[in-house]
Structures are given as C-alpha cells and as structure tokens.
Amino acid sequence: MDKALINLGTKLKELREQAGFTQSNIANFLKVDQSLVSKIEKGERSITTDMLERLSTLFGVSVATLLTRYVEEQTMSYSLRAKDIDTNDYEMISAIHRIALNSDFMTEKLITSSKEDNDHE
Amino acid sequence: MNDLNIWKRAERIRKLLGEDSSSPIDLFALTNSINGLSIVNYPMGENISGMCVKGKHSNVFAINSLMTLGRQRFTLAHELFHLYYDNEPSTSICLKNIGAGNEKEIQADQFASYLIMPPLALTEMIQKLKESSSGVITLNEVVFLEQYYQISRQAVLYRLIQERELSHQDAEKMRQNIIQSAINLGYDDTLYKPSPLNKRYRTYGHYIKLAEKVLEKGLVSRGKYEELLLEAFRSDLVYGEDIDEEILD
C-alpha cells in the first residue's frame, strides 16, 4: 500500500475523531459514500484534490498539514453534540475556516515580502 | 473558575478595549477595532450562536446572522472569552442556549454577561429602577435594561434570574411578545431583529484590510484578490453593489 495514502488516512481519522465527526458526517459533507471515507482512512483509496481541499477547510488546517503525518494539537472544540450540527453547518464551518486560512495565506505573503525587502536592503 | 475571577477577566477586557467599568459598550465597534480580528456574519443552524477560530497569524469570529442584533452582541462578548482566555482549541463552535454546554461555554457566557452588564453598575441600575417600580422588576424594567445595554431579552432574563431579581416563572412570561413590549414603550425594534438580508453573509475587519494590502503590494493578482473577497462574501467590494448614496453631515 502507498505510504502517503496511509499517512493521509491516519491523519484524516485522527482529525475526524478529535472533532467528534462520524465517517457518515464526512461522507455527507464530501457528497460521497461512507464506504469511500472508510477506505480513504485505511489508506486503500486515493483522494481527489477537490476532496483534499474541502477536508482542509472543514478541519481548518492547510492541505500541507493534512498531508503531514502528525496531528500536533486539537483542532476543534464543540460545545454541542455532533447531532446538534445540521448538514448546512458543515458548510458553515468550512466557509469560516476558509476565511481563517485565507487570512493566514495573505499574512504569510506579507511576511515573506517584508523579509525579502529587508534582505535587499 | 469562580464568578469573581470571571468578573475580573471581564473588567480586564473592558480596560483593554479602552472602556470604563460601568458604561454600556458598543461591541460591534469594539471588536472591529481589535487588531488581527475579522468578523464574519453567517446564517447558522438553530443550535449554533457563533464560532471563534484562532489562526496562526490572525483570528476570526463568526456570528449567526439569523439571531437578533441583541443576541449577536452577546455572542461577540462570548467569543472574546474564547479569544483571550481559552488556550486549548484553535476553533470553538458555540451553543445558542445561554448557560448551557461544557464548563468553558458556561464560563464564556458568564464572562459575556459581566462584560456587557458589569455587576456593580447593574446592581446600581436595578436599585434605581426598583425605586420607581414599587420595589420589583417588571417587564418595563427588563425592556429598559435590554435597550440600555443593547442586548437580547434572553440574556437580560438569564442574568436577572442569576441575580435573584426574577423568578423562572416571571421570566418565562417575559419571553413572549418581545418586540411588541419594546414598541409599546416607545423603543425602536432593530435590537430584536436579525441582520438585514443583504448583510447576512459578510466579512468585516482585518481580512478586508489584508486583501487590500496584498493587492496593493502586488503580492496577489487582481483575480486572486477578487477570489479572496468573494470567499469572504464581499461581492459588494468586487462588483460595487449595495453602496447607498453618501451623506456627509
């Protein structure tokens, strides 16, 4: 089995369990069958870039983080049970995380540009 | 953490935001002035009031825009607790029911209540109100308090029950005809309504400034800039919609 796929599957499972989501929640969000999510977590199936992108925004981590092996810290905390979150709320969580990730993207652009300016001086 | 500590924390945040320890505060304006914070209006499910995302470089508050403006203010105050005092998770998704959920959520609600209605100021205000209402808190005083602090009926009732100024039974009766009770006393009804339709999806604050900056410095193309704004529900900035006639007065 492909080691990268196994790493991604393990990471996905860890993030999903930390967030308290079921495989079925993830499958609904990705609009795929639950068995596919199960296979991805076992490293038995590959994942499309679109799915990878959607998972990164759902969990609020970059795609690169999703592809690295370790989960450094808890990523999400819910004061409500997963059953209190309706289907549209997964889209909401993803949309808000997208904004946070975009903010980090823009800030990193500014930091890099400022470093380059300093190096030129 | 006991109530006194939560009160102290609320006091500290008032100070940090440049506010005294007794006056009503404008949480929309204050949170907009916090460095590195973006506020997102988003219509959420009926159980969720908001979300706080602590990012690597900046932070995001998302507020359920289907809740009344008064309740949105309470949520902003609640999320401030997560931002400043909740060290554990990077994302918190918060319940709509005040005083419910895990310990952190209950603390965040208490903090919000103290931040908006500081205990000493509220006690004085209640005393004053009771003097002119034969010693009891009636619906009129409740409406006065929610208008004075610009906060929801639910948040005021929750606090008055805690302060033993109202029984659960009396509070229950005041959970109906909320708008009418305020209108009858000559108040505007804006406090009791959700965000206007054209502002239910919208991002304010740090994010918009960041987008302008990266464009201005040539760090992203115009296409990417527009994509960033559209993902933050700011089509008005991309297509120039919704700009009302300006009045300078």
Region locations from a protein language model:
Chain B
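Active-site hotspot residues in diverse enzymes, especially metal/ion-binding acidic/histidine motifs
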Residues: 1-249
